[in-house]
UniProtKB/Swiss-Prot annotation:
A motif (YXXL motif) lies at residues 739-742. One of its GO terms (biological process) is symbiont entry into host cell. Residues 20-707 are extracellular. It comes from Simian immunodeficiency virus agm.vervet (isolate AGM3). The record marks 543-544 as: Cleavage. Residues 114-173 are annotated as: V1. Residues 751-779 are annotated as: Disordered. This is Envelope glycoprotein gp160. Some of the most genetically diverse regions of the viral genome are present in Env. They are called variable regions 1 through 5 (V1 through V5). The YXXL motif is involved in determining the exact site of viral release at the surface of infected mononuclear cells and promotes endocytosis.
């Protein structure tokens, strides 16, 4: 019992230790994670005309979509979708570059004397026409268009009848005087203006004082050539390192917080560049159903209605007549294009074709189906009316550009046709539909509308006005598909809902690009693991060639973290391969068009997209390098994971979900990684200072020992050489000083016959002491030198003996250490042999036991039928 309790406690302790094991921050490179971005996208187009080739790169026709198993929020309007905002800015630049408005100089901001031009046709209306127009009713039989009897589809119109019902454009011939080539002399000029483009003081029609409209804020800079572009479609593409997400949900209506059918693409579909107010022309998105998009899902001030393509709605606009343009040279370098003198233009007009009433009826049915939190108007579709707005000409009319000319079309007749009633623009009933001149009145129903062409317009993107050259010569015509309309939903006290055409241009790009979302790929992720970085070595991961694209990389966004982490090497290759491939394609296109791109604004944007991609790639690599993780897909660190309450579910959680949970921790994690990297660099620096002693196995390098012995041998030779040099120097010094005999050890006797104490003649006193004094001095000096030489010799001998003994002792110790090492290696070898023998015996015993168990199981299986038979026999007997 006690043993069982101890085993249980031991197992519980082991489990606690395993569960509380320290985790460390691990850096993963190549995780499929992204964040919203507002980076500048670039454009592609299949069009090969001049504008397209100078502003966009050729289309690669790659429409690959990779589905993602994730949910993502989407928003269609420009204030929350940077791609939609970019479209508005870029299309405005298209207008500026191609239509070339004239600005900054005001030669025509002067007083002009104007005379109204007479009509080129009789002002009286023929009787046949009068008879057909005086009693116009709501029935379709009075319309100048043929209608299919079995449906409400408008098939064709009689252009002659339409043109007879339209008035001519009112125009005036204006004369003015200004300095020309000679500055001190004024010259008279004559220019024809449309009456809508001049401001005149009250007076008779024969002679009026007029000024150009918006004279104070719209001026002319240069002679502006008349240019235009045909229908142009382009695609927005994400720079390298970025991507476009697309929402494919069926119920998407411009706003959704959890779009589930998401795919990733490199470029959008082809979108149109037609700018209009009210109606959406030539849209790229159309389905077999009517859709209503509300801004931010709840706004009634900005509503997008997408028509059902089943109704085949189109509009054809024409400017009849063979208009001619007369160039007027105003001054040196400035030519103003005027209409030819004494001519009046016929009005332009637009004819609406298709089942418009059926489409409008379906729109009303969809409006009343809106949830109550999004629509509080009437549920009676008969009380829902389509109307126009009042105010600036661009807002009050259908405004669009047709072959470079700006059309302003008054929609009253067509709106009366759609609403199937005869009222004035204020919804007041009126009797009769006869208007001014030949034209029908505002209460008439028509499937066509009258249009004006103007040269002075309000800029739709900036708060300014632009002046363009007068309309071009010849016949103008363009046909467009109507895919939707921009409206406002207004309610009033009469239990009526007014659907008002809106001039908001951004609705066009919301319809075209609202399903797309520009994101920045952030391939660096953090997660806790139980592996700590080994700081003993620094080896660099080998880089491999890249062969796949980044769409496949993002395709793993919906997989679990564990499955994605096991393929990080391949995913990082996909990411970098996509970056490199996109850069290669973009660079090739830029190089092919470098001469044409160098002066265009969109060309600069394309180059900027390339620079942005390079900056992003270098930024990611710089971050990895700062953490010591350069060129690594999985990089373990020495930073402990301090947030134990935040751990990933590797089998069920995606990287995107995990990154969103720890996004607020990223700042702390990166700071700790940088500090750990700095400390590691300091440790590495100190470690390298001791690198010559760091490797234990370097002691067994024979070449190092030879170097040490060589140094010792050279030291001994140096000492011996110094000793020899000193000896030679001593000998030479003695020779140079001369020979000095040593003092005698035995007294030298004087000459014979002379006693010791004998005195010579004339000598007196004892001379013995004085005669021996020089000998004593000489003897003392020689003795000192002899002693010094002996001591030097002894010191050299002792030094040699000490050096010899030291070397001998060192060799003895080395021999002893080598013997110990040899003994240790022998013991290790013996232990290893014993361990191998023990493992072999253990394996043999285990194999034998396994064989016995298998044999027993085999015999049991084989003997089972016999034992069953024996048991049955015993039971039956």
């Amino acid at each position: 019992m006690k043993l069982t309790l101890l085993i249980g406690i031991l197992l519980i302790g082991i489990g606690v230790v395993l569960n509380t094991r320290q985790q460390w921050v691990t850096v993963f490179y190549g995780v499929p994670v992204w964040k919203n971005s507002s980076v500048q996208a670039f454009c592609m187009t299949p069009t090969t005309r001049l504008w397209a080739t100078t502003n966009s790169i050729p289309d690669d026709h790659d429409y690959t979509e990779v589905p993602l198993n994730i949910t993502e929020p989407f928003e269609a309007w420009a204030d929350r979708n940077p791609l939609v905002a970019q479209a508005g800015s870029n299309i405005h630049l298209l207008f500026e570059q191609t239509l070339k408005p004239c600005v900054k100089l005001s030669p025509l901001c002067i007083k002009m004397s104007c005379v109204e031009l007479n009509s080129s046709e009789p002002t009286t209306t023929p009787k046949s026409t009068t008879a057909s127009t005086t009693n116009i009713t709501a029935s379709t039989t009075t319309l100048p268009c043929v209608q299919n009897k079995t449906s409400t589809v408008l098939e064709s119109c009689n252009e002659t009848i339409i043109e007879k019902e339209l008035n001519e454009e009112p125009a005036s011939n204006c004369t003015f005087a200004m300095a020309g080539y000679v500055r001190d002399q004024k010259k008279k000029y004559s220019v024809v203006w449309n009456d809508a483009e001049i401001m005149c003081k009250k007076g008779n029609n024969s002679n009026r004082e007029c000024y150009m409209i918006h004279c104070n804020d719209s001026v002319i800079k240069e002679a502006c050539d008349k240019t235009y572009w045909d229908e142009l479609r382009l695609r927005y593409c994400a720079p390298a390192g970025f991507a476009l997400l697309k929402c494919n949900d069926y119920d998407y209506a411009g706003f959704k917080t959890n779009c589930s059918n998401v795919s990733v693409v490199h470029c959008t579909n082809l979108i149109n560049t037609t700018v209009t107010t009210g109606l959406l022309l030539n849209g790229s998105y159309s389905e077999n159903r009517t859709q209503i998009w509300q801004k931010h899902r709840v706004s009634n001030d900005s509503v997008l209605v997408l028509f059902n393509k089943h109704y085949n709605l189109t509009v054809t606009c024409k400017r009849p007549g063979n208009k001619t343009v007369l160039p007027v040279t105003i001054m040196a370098g400035l030519v103003f294009h005027s209409q030819r003198y004494n001519t009046r233009l016929r009005q332009a007009w637009c004819h609406f074709q298709g089942n418009w009433r059926g489409a409008w009826k379906e729109v009303k049915n969809e409006i009343v189906k809106l949830p109550k939190d999004r629509y509080q108007g009437t549920n009676d579709t008969e009380e829902i009316y389509l109307q126009r707005l009042f105010g600036d000409p661009e807002a009050a009319n259908l405004w669009f550009n047709c072959q470079g000319e700006f059309f302003y079309c008054k929609m009253d007749w067509f709106l009366n046709y759609l609403n199937n009633r005869t009222v004035d623009p204020d919804h007041n009933p009126c009797n009769g539909t006869k208007g001014k001149g030949k034209a029908p009145g505002p209460c008439a129903q028509r499937t066509y509308v009258a249009c004006h062409i103007r040269s002075v317009i309000n800029d739709w993107y900036t708060l300014s006005r632009k002046t363009y050259a007068p309309p071009r010569e010849g016949h103008l015509q363009c046909t467009s598909t109507v895919t939707g309309m921009s409206v406002e939903l207004n309610y009033n006290s009469k239990n009526r809902t007014n659907v008002t055409l809106s001039p908001q241009i951004e609705t066009i790009w919301a319809a075209e690009l609202g399903r797309y979302k520009l994101v920045e790929i952030t391939p660096i992720g953090f997660a806790p693991t139980e592996v700590r970085r080994y700081t003993g070595g620094h080896d660099r991961t080998k880089r491999v060639p890249f062969v796949l694209g980044f769409l496949g990389f993002l395709g793993a966004a919906g997989t679990a973290m564990g499955a994605a982490a096991t393929a990080l090497t391949v995913q990082s290759q996909h990411l970098l391969a996509g970056i490199l491939q996109q850069q290669k394609n973009l660079l090739a296109a830029v190089e092919a068009q470098q001469q044409m791109l160098k002066l265009t604004i969109w060309g600069v944007k394309n180059l900027n997209a390339r620079v942005t991609a390079l900056e992003k790639y270098l930024e990611d690599q710089a971050r990895l390098n700062a953490w010591g993780c350069a060129w690594k897909q999985v990089c373990h660190t020495t930073v402990p994971w301090q947030w134990n309450n935040r751990t990933p579910d590797w089998n069920n959680m995606t990287w995107l979900e995990w990154e969103r949970q720890i996004s607020y921790l990223e700042g702390n994690i990166t700071t700790q990684l940088e500090e750990a990297r700095a400390q590691e660099e300091k440790n590495l620096d100190a470690y390298q200072k001791l690198s010559s002693w760091s490797d234990f196995w370097s002691w067994f390098d024979f070449s190092k020992w030879l170097n040490i012995l060589k140094i010792g041998f050279l030291d001994v030779l140096g000492i011996i050489g110094l000793r020899l040099l000193y000896t030679v120097y001593s000998c030479i010094a003695r020779v140079r000083q001369g020979y000095s005999p040593l003092s005698p050890q035995i007294h030298i006797h004087p000459w014979k016959g002379q006693p010791d104490n004998a005195e010579g003649p004339g000598e007196g006193g004892d001379k013995r002491k004085n005669s021996s004094e020089p000998w004593q001095k000489e003897s003392g000096t020689a003795e000192w030198k002899s002693n010094w030489c002996k001591r030097l010799t002894n010191w050299c001998s002792i030094s040699s003996i000490w050096l010899y003994n030291s070397c001998l002792t060192l060799l003895v110790h080395l021999r002893s250490a080598f013997q110990y090492i040899q003994y240790g290696l022998g013991e290790l070898k013996a232990a290893a042999q014993e361990a191998v023998v023990a493992l072999a015996r253990l394996a043999q015993n285990a194999g034998y036991q396994i064989w016995l168990a298998c044999r027993s199981a085999y015999r049991a299986i084989i003997n089972s039928p016999r034992r069953v038979r024996q048991g049955l026999e015993g039971i039956l007997n």
